[in-house]
Design a protein with these regions (language model features):
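Hydrophobic/aromatic ligand-binding patch that stacks against planar heteroaromatic rings
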Residues: 11, 60-62, 160, 275-278
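Short amphipathic alpha-helices in soluble, non-transmembrane regions
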Residues: 311-315
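Amidase signature
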Residues: 122-271, 279, 317-325
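Residues within well-ordered alpha-helices
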Residues: 7-8, 32, 58, 157, ...
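Short low-complexity, flexible loop/linker segments enriched in glycine and/or proline
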Residues: 34-38, 85-88, 181-188, 257, ...
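Short glycine/serine-rich loop segments
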Residues: 5-6, 13-120, 283-295
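Short, well-ordered beta-strand elements
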Residues: 292-310
Length: 325
């Protein structure tokens, strides 16, 4: 039982937020799907029988069903953006302080771009200046063949931004394997403090973290903290456009049926672009482009949150539209 309110939620309450209840999330928010041990597994209202993503999958279901216009979520590796992509809604991971290798940002899921801007206190500009837009279709953190409809959506979005007057260029993976290896170790180290029984995946991370020595710990923090500079050095662009998911949301139970190691790696294959923005501390936004099966991901490298939302508005069309089930 909690003994105090999280500072982020306390600020929301002080500003008049109404919190009707708590939604389902996986154990410690450590998976990109929402199948908590011993509890019901929320279904994806836009693709019944398939995962709504995670870790904020329960919140995404509430928003996608229209039960609430927005819901609190957190993002330590894509946990706002992945559920948004799975359920046809809008998810924004704000820029955050990555001090001491912190990957987590607090934010919201929302049904429309207008609602997302409102809850994130962003004023969407009527127009944005000409920007340099990098297009990344190469997976960053895993090798995977990306589904054709995901790639086609990014291609059409890039064309739309070019027609809107932006300079659009292809970019390549910005770094090698070391940053994600560091992220994996950071998750493992953060799991060491988990007491008692845990799910197979969390137990595996905890055991793995307990074997990481002090020298390696210092090295992974240094590597993690260098990601922002690596990204900015690699790409001379203002905004990054990429897919969010490599393939459609899989059936409920798909990941959990695997060994913990395969589970972790396959989740990474499914979402190979998300974690980079957690390590870099940069803002990123996911929304449905054209239809719920083609979510796209735009990240702010050298622009403000308002400008990022402005770019999204160019692609989103009517910012008050809501995907109907």
């Amino acid at each position: 039982m909690a003994t105090e309110t999280d500072p982020f939620l306390l600020r929301c309450l002080r500003q008049g937020a109404i919190i009707p209840g708590k939604t389902l999330a996986p154990e410690l928010g450590l998976t990109a799907y929402t199948e908590p041990v011993g509890l019901p597994h929320p279904d994806n209202p836009t693709l019944p029988g398939h995962t709504p993503g995670g870790s904020s999958g329960g919140a995404a279901v509430m928003v996608a069903r229209g039960l609430v216009r927005a819901a609190h979520a957190s993002d330590g590796g894509g946990s706002i953006r992945i559920p948004a992509a799975c359920t046809g809604i809008v998810g924004y991971k704000p820029p955050h302080d990555t001090g001491n290798a912190n990957p987590v940002a607090q934010g919201f899921l929302a049904g429309t771009l207008t609602d997302s801007a409102y809850v994130n206190n962003v004023t969407v500009p009527a127009r944005v200046p000409r920007l340099r837009v990098g297009v990344l279709i190469e997976p960053v953190h895993a090798e995977i063949e990306v589904s054709e409809h995901m790639l086609s959506a990014v291609d059409r979005a890039a064309s739309a931004l070019s027609k809107a007057g932006h300079d659009v260029m292809m970019v390549r993976r910005p770094y090698g394997d070391a940053p994600f290896a560091a992220f994996h170790d950071i998750l493992s180290l953060r799991s060491v403090k988990v007491p008692g029984e845990a799910s197979p995946l969390v137990s595996w991370l905890r055991d793995r973290g307990s074997r990481i020595g002090e020298h390696r710990k210092e090295a992974v923090i240094t590597e993690f903290m260098s990601v922002k500079s690596q990204v900015l050095r690699a790409w001379d662009v203002d905004v990054l456009l990429s897919p969010m998911l490599a393939f459609d949301p899989p059936p409920i139970g798909y990941f959990r049926a695997m060994s913990p190691e395969s589970d972790f790696y396959t989740q990474t294959q499914w979402t190979p672009w998300a974690t980079m923005f957690n390590m870099a501390g940069l803002g990123a936004l996911v929304f449905p482009f054209e239809n719920i099966r083609t979510p796209i991901h735009v990240g702010a490298l050298r622009v403000s949150p308002a400008q990022l939302f402005g770019v999204a508005a160019t692609l989103y069309g009517d910012s008050d539209r809501r995907i109907t089930l």
